[in-house]
Amino acid sequence: MSRHPEVKWAQRIDKVYITVQLADAKDAKVNLEPEGVFSFSATAGTDGNLYESKLELNDKVNVEESKISVGVRSIFCIVEKAEAKWWKKLVRDDQKAPHFVKVDWDKWVDEDDDGADVNVDGMDFSNFGGMGGMGGMGGMGDMMGGMGGMGGMGGMAEMMGGMGGMGGMGGMDEFEDESDDEEEVSKPQDAEKAAEAGKSQESDAKTETS
């Protein structure tokens, strides 16, 4: 059986801020319809519990201009109203707000004040309209998974491993060893030549004496 995540909301004359409080949400899907239907589903917790909620918002919305940001602790949505006016509550006037929907006092301003927009610096947003709802975010998982194909870079590791054949440059040592061997082999020949030269000098000396 699914559970309901806590949903907080605040508004400005032209937009609504909706925050779904759910830490470490997995497979999150958020859908927004022009008529104002907002639906959410995701799994969370060590047991992978399913969390769902569906709200019929107070009025129509502009899906194309609305944005969503998925964080570690929550999913934050900026829903643009189709008509710039203040809503009496988040859901339709003929409905009672669910128990899990609460006012986000940190972002709330009174209608008379209509303060500045909420500071969203540091948040990464995606457009609802361009993504067909956050369900499209799953596509990002696939895309990132595809980048796992970067594991194909392991092929580079193999290629580089093949360059380990450069270790064959160690063959240079073999060349050096061979040249050393040649030097060592030539030394006895030099000794023999020296001995022959010595004998020749001795015979010359005997000839001169005689």
UniProtKB/Swiss-Prot annotation:
<dbReference type="GO" id="GO:0005829">
    <property type="term" value="C:cytosol"/>
</dbReference>
<comment type="similarity">
    <text>Belongs to the p23/wos2 family.</text>
</comment>
<dbReference type="GO" id="GO:0051131">
    <property type="term" value="P:chaperone-mediated protein complex assembly"/>
</dbReference>
<dbReference type="GO" id="GO:0005634">
    <property type="term" value="C:nucleus"/>
</dbReference>
<dbReference type="Pfam" id="PF04969">
    <property type="entry name" value="CS"/>
</dbReference>
<dbReference type="InterPro" id="IPR008978">
    <property type="entry name" value="HSP20-like_chaperone"/>
</dbReference>
<feature type="compositionally biased region" description="Acidic residues">
    <location>
        <begin position="173"/>
        <end position="184"/>
    </location>
</feature>
<dbReference type="InterPro" id="IPR007052">
    <property type="entry name" value="CS_dom"/>
</dbReference>
<dbReference type="GO" id="GO:0006950">
    <property type="term" value="P:response to stress"/>
</dbReference>
<protein>
    <recommendedName>
        <fullName>Uncharacterized protein OsI_027940</fullName>
    </recommendedName>
</protein>
<dbReference type="GO" id="GO:0051879">
    <property type="term" value="F:Hsp90 protein binding"/>
</dbReference>
<feature type="compositionally biased region" description="Basic and acidic residues">
    <location>
        <begin position="185"/>
        <end position="210"/>
    </location>
</feature>
<feature type="region of interest" description="Disordered">
    <location>
        <begin position="165"/>
        <end position="210"/>
    </location>
</feature>
<dbReference type="InterPro" id="IPR045250">
    <property type="entry name" value="p23-like"/>
</dbReference>
<dbReference type="GO" id="GO:0006457">
    <property type="term" value="P:protein folding"/>
</dbReference>
<feature type="domain" description="CS">
    <location>
        <begin position="2"/>
        <end position="91"/>
    </location>
</feature>
<dbReference type="GO" id="GO:0051087">
    <property type="term" value="F:protein-folding chaperone binding"/>
</dbReference>
